[in-house]
Amino acid sequence: RPDIFKEKTESNMEKDILDIINDEEKISLVAEENEKILGIIVLKIKKIINHINLKDSKVLWIEELCVDENNRGKGIGKILINNAKKIAKDLKCERLELNCWEANKDAITFYEKQGMKSQRRVMEIKI
């Protein structure tokens, strides 16, 4: 969706990845081989406290999960998700959550294979 996503170039992607890795409020795991980044998962703890509708809880939120296109289907994403599950358990989080775009059918299928289920839907109307 070009109306939402920025155009990515190799130089701005590298800068974005370094900014993410250096963000102290986030947990970043990087899969690499021969100093080349194959995939990255970015995690953040979200605490839900005194919400009008929701019970108090602690969630490990996946902000980003990206695997290099040439290295997809090799189990890298699965390894990153499994490590996120371990971190969530160690941090005593109740759930591991993420957002996924409806049009990204491959990602939806991947996340379902990892045991995730759809929880809610974000709707929009263009103005």
Task: Identify the role of each PLM range.
Residues R1-I17:
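Conserved GNAT-fold acetyl-CoA-binding loop/helix
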Residues K15-V30:
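A short helix-loop-beta-strand connector motif used in the catalytic cores of GNAT acetyltransferases and
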Residues V30, K36-I45, W61, C66:
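Conserved beta-strand in the GNAT
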Residues K46-N53, K105-T109:
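A short, acidic/glycine-rich surface segment
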Residues N53-E69, N99, R121-E124:
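Conserved acetyl-CoA binding element of GNAT-fold acetyltransferases
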Residues E64-V67, G73-K86, K113:
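Conserved acetyl-CoA-binding loop-helix of GNAT-fold acetyltransferases
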Residues K78, N82, D90, E102-R120, ...:
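Conserved active-site alpha-helix within GNAT-family acetyltransferase domains
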Residues A88-N99:
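Conserved GNAT acetyl-CoA-binding A-motif
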